[in-house]
Regions:
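Bacterial lipoprotein signal-peptidase II cleavage site
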Residues: 18-32
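Ligand-binding clefts/hinges and TM-proximal coupling segments of bilobed small-molecule sensing domains
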Residues: 23, 50, 171-193, 226-231, ...
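Periplasmic-binding protein-like
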Residues: 64, 140-147, 214, 218, ...
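Bilobed "Venus flytrap"/periplasmic-binding protein-like clamshell domains
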Residues: 64-67, 78-91, 123, 144-196, ...
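Short helix-initiation/N-cap motifs at beta->coil->alpha
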Residues: 83, 98-109, 189-204, 238
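Extended ligand-binding regions for polar small-molecule ligands
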Residues: 83-92, 150-153, 162-163, 168-171, ...
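Acidic, polar ligand-binding/catalytic clefts
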Residues: 87, 91, 96-158, 229, ...
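A ligand-binding cleft/hinge motif common to bilobed small-molecule-binding domains
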Residues: 105-106, 122-131, 175-180, 201-236
Length: 280
């Protein structure tokens, strides 16, 4: 609350000091506004942390077309390696677990609006390190190319003149943007909303290759019993982490410490071996 001190002795110089006073008042107003904004942000973060601790709810944002990390099972229920990790973490923390499917290209809006508490679905940290409050990486990953087994494509060099498809706003798309010398050789680079569609396009011959996560590629090939292969030369190396809204360190710390305790157990259930890296 600004206070004005005016006396008769200053009346004679009031006109001369008006500009300076205006500048000072403006600075004070700006400082007050900045302080209020910071306090508001702190209150929002505290509220978010409170609702996801002490018997609250853990709302996990995920792509429902990203097996084996998150997808719709044969029984119509959401399942996946990442979702089972999240569910077990919530159980151990005494939180109600809720899997919330999201459009992958809207994930930031969902997180910022508070519709979800975290993004947990094969979420690549590389290139996004400063955008979220992250757990430690819990899994290593690569971006690779998938092609038909009987195609003449055996390396990235063979992709010249070919049609390549990638999920919009994915890590594979980001990796391709970092390799303009490679993408310049493609006949066309297409984007799709999900990898199920991409695999159907590949099966039908509408595209020649898909750029995607190696863990998802291997699972898709196995489940479809399809005659596809993964090229040996990878596009990029990266790591998966759980992303929270910037500043939500309390929930991040609770999730991370719990994840370290049980990630290996869930990994062995899904992959018959421990593929996790957290706590190692």
């Amino acid at each position: 609350m600004k206070k004005r001190f005016v006396s008769a002795a200053l009346a004679a110089v009031m006109a001369l000091s008006m500009t300076a006073c205006g500048s000072s008042n403006s600075a004070a107003e700006t400082t007050a506004a900045d302080t209020e904004a910071a306090e508001s942000q702190a209150e929002e973060t505290t509220a978010e942390e409170a609702k996801t601790t002490d018997g609250g709810t853990l709302i996990v944002g995920f792509d429902q077309d990203f097996p084996p990390m998150g997808f719709v099972g044969d029984d119509g229920e959401y399942t996946g390696f990442d979702l089972e990790l999240a569910q077990e973490v919530a159980k151990r923390l005494g939180l109600e677990y809720k899997a919330q499917p999201i459009a992958w290209d809207s994930k930031d809006m969902e997180l910022e609006s508070g519709n979800i508490d975290c993004i947990w679905n094969g979420f690549t940290m590389t290139g996004r390190e400063d955008d979220y409050t992250w757990t430690e990486p819990y899994m290593a990953n690569q971006q690779v190319f998938v092609v038909a087994n009987d195609s003449d494509i055996n390396s990235q060099a063979d992709l010249a003149g070919k049609i390549v498809e990638v999920q919009a706003d994915s890590s594979a798309e980001a990796a391709l943007k970092e390799a303009p010398e490679l993408t310049a050789t493609f006949k066309e680079l297409l984007t799709t909303a999900d990898y199920n569609t991409a695999f159907m396009d590949l099966e039908q011959g509408a595209v020649d290759a898909i750029a995607m996560d190696v863990i998802v590629a291997g699972y898709q090939i196995q489940q479809r019993n399809a005659d596809f292969k993964i090229l040996d030369d990878s596009l990029s190396e990266e790591e998966y982490g759980v992303g929270f809204k910037k500043g939500n360190t309390e929930l991040r710390d609770k999730v991370q410490s719990t994840l370290e305790e049980m990630a290996q157990e869930v990994s062995e259930k899904w992959f018959s071996k421990d593929v996790t890296t957290i706590g190692k």
